[in-house]
Amino acid sequence: MPFEKRKVSADNLAVRSWALAHQAGVFTYPHQDADGEATYAIVVSGVKLWTLYFSCDPTQSRDQLLQHFNNLCDPDANVHPQLTAETVCLYPGDLLIQPPGQFHSVYTPTAAFTIGGHFYSYECFHLTEIARYFDVTLKGELTNQVHHHSLETLMQMIVGLPHLDRERKLKKNTLLALCLMVIHPKRYRLKVHDTIRSTQVSAYCQTIATDIVNSMGGPEFDPQHPYFGKRSYVDAGEDVDWILLISNWLKC
C-alpha cells in the first residue's frame, strides 16, 4: 500500500520477479545484488555456473571486509587470499536462494533462460544492512542495479511487526539492523536514489524503530557497540522477545 497517497515505486513490483535470457559464453563479474535484497533464481533451460564468495574471517571490521570485496570486484585483480569461493552448477528446475550481500559471479556455458526475483526477510536484515552500507560507501560500484523502493518497503516491515505470527522467532542483530535503516535512512541512500521525504508515516515508523533500539540498549551508530564491533557479520544474534519490545504499539 502507498504511504500518504504517494505513488508506489515501480520497483516494488519489478523486483519481485524477473527473467533473464543469456547466450552461451556470458560471464557476469563478481558483484552483490543491489540494496541488500535476498535473491532467488530458477533455471528454466540451459546451465548456470554460480560462484559464491565468502570471507575467510567474517569477524573482520567493516572496512576490512569492504576492501576485500572491493578487490574481488576489480577485474584486474586475480588473487584474493582473504576470500574463499564455491561454485554451484544449476540445471533446469534447480532453485538457488541467495542471502543479502552475497558476492557472486555467474558464467553461462550454454544458452540459458532463468527466472527469479528479489525480496527482504526479517531473518536476514543484519546482512541487508551491511550490504547497503557497502553500496553507499563505494557509491554503488559493487552492484549492477539501483532500486528505489527500499526505504518504503523497510518502513512497511516495521509497521508490519505487530501482524507477525506470535510464534515467529526474531534475532537481535537482525531487528537492530532493520530499525537502524529506518531511523537513519540517509546513511544508506545513494545519490541516484529517490529523494527521502519526511512524512507523518516515516516519523511514525522511526518512532517505533527508535523505541525498539532503545529497549535493546542502543547502538545509535556508536562504533564501540557490539553490533558494530568484532563479531561475525553473518551472525544474526540471539533470540529477542520482540513482542515485548513492541508491546506499546500493540495497543495502538
Tell me the role of every PLM-derived stretch:
Residues 151-214, 221:
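Eukaryotic intrinsically disordered, low-complexity regulatory regions
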Residues 1-92, 102-168, 211-252:
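Active-site region of the double-stranded beta-helix
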